[in-house]
């Protein structure tokens, strides 16, 4: 049985990520099923930070297809280079969007989303195999601290792809 996520009583993201990372490593320890692993990681991130939507889109041919997530119903498919997720996939880099209404071609899966961060996950050959997508109802809710920490989370997920 999986142990519950335990966190310090703080809103400081550095402290929260520091406490969460070993717990994510433990969630992934000896878990080889990508669906199970991605489901637990999305739950751990949403539980820790309370973001509106946390989940994964997997590369399937020429589009991203929704995978495990926590939050409201999501867009099912996103084209290469479309929206924030498709752009992060195409450009193979983390994208932080402080105000989604200002992002050209933003795909509004939820009208409540104000800011977003998308982090690519690479396979063993270095190709983008999936993306981690996180939406917040707060404007400018993500910064480089989040980007760096979430990139570390995605590195832990690489062996699943």
Segments (PLM) and residue ranges:
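Short hydrophobic/aromatic beta-strand element in the GNAT-like acyltransferase core
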Residues: 53, 118, 131
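A generic structural motif
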Residues: 138-140
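Intrinsically disordered, low-complexity terminal regulatory regions
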Residues: 1-73, 152, 156-161
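Regulatory sensory and allosteric helical modules in signal-transduction proteins
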Residues: 59-111
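A short, aliphatic-rich beta-strand micro-motif
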Residues: 115-123
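A generic structural signal for residues located within well-ordered alpha-helices
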Residues: 33-36, 80, 113, 145
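Well-ordered alpha/beta subsegment
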Residues: 142-144, 149, 159
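Sensory-domain boundary capping and coupling elements
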Residues: 122-136
């Amino acid at each position: 049985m999986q142990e519950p996520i335990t966190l310090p009583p703080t809103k400081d993201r550095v402290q929260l990520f520091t406490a969460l990372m070993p717990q994510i490593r433990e969630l992934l320890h000896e878990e080889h099923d990508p669906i199970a692993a991605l489901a637990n990681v999305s739950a751990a991130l949403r539980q820790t930070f309370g973001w509106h939507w946390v989940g994964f889109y997997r590369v399937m041919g020429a589009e991203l297809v929704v995978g495990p997530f926590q939050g409201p119903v999501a867009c099912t498919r996103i084209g290469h280079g479309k929206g924030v997720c498709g752009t992060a996939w195409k450009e193979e880099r983390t994208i932080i969007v402080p105000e989604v209404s200002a992002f050209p071609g933003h795909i509004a899966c939820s009208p409540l989303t104000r800011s977003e961060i998308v982090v690519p996950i690479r396979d063993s050959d270095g190709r983008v195999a999936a993306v981690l997508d996180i939406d917040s109802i707060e404007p400018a809710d993500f910064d480089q601290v989040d980007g760096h920490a979430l990139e570390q989370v995605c590195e832990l997920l690489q062996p699943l792809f």
